[in-house]
């Protein structure tokens, strides 16, 4: 049975979160929370989003997802201090103009084709395998 585009898009989003956490990991597999700096193994981290995950224009943008500890991602994003820390980290890393562009994109709708999503999924899976091999080496 063919997966719906929504299901395929969700698979891509989950893979992107895994990729981002792996990419941020050091040789021992640890990465720092984007907002509080706490170091944990990449498998214990979550993929936190600057622009909430439901916004389609930014959902599959690598720049929108960063490692976050469970505390910051699940509970902290409800607190203004964590939201401000996330935005501050974004500005420090990408610059104010880029962050403002992303914030404008939050109100836009992007419809990805099945072909785009299947290619995206294959590409991100390849990148994940490469990073997993590097960590095992």
Walk through the language-model features, giving the residues of each.
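A boundary/linker detector
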Residues: 1-19, 24, 39, 102-137
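Short cysteine-rich loop/turn motifs with clustered Cys
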Residues: 14-46, 69
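Short beta-strand-alpha-helix junction that forms the catalytic/metal-binding core
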Residues: 31, 55-76
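Cys/His-coordinated zinc-binding microdomains
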Residues: 37, 51, 73
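Short Cys/His-rich "knuckle" micro-motifs
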Residues: 43-50, 79-83
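Basic nucleic-acid-binding interfaces
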Residues: 87
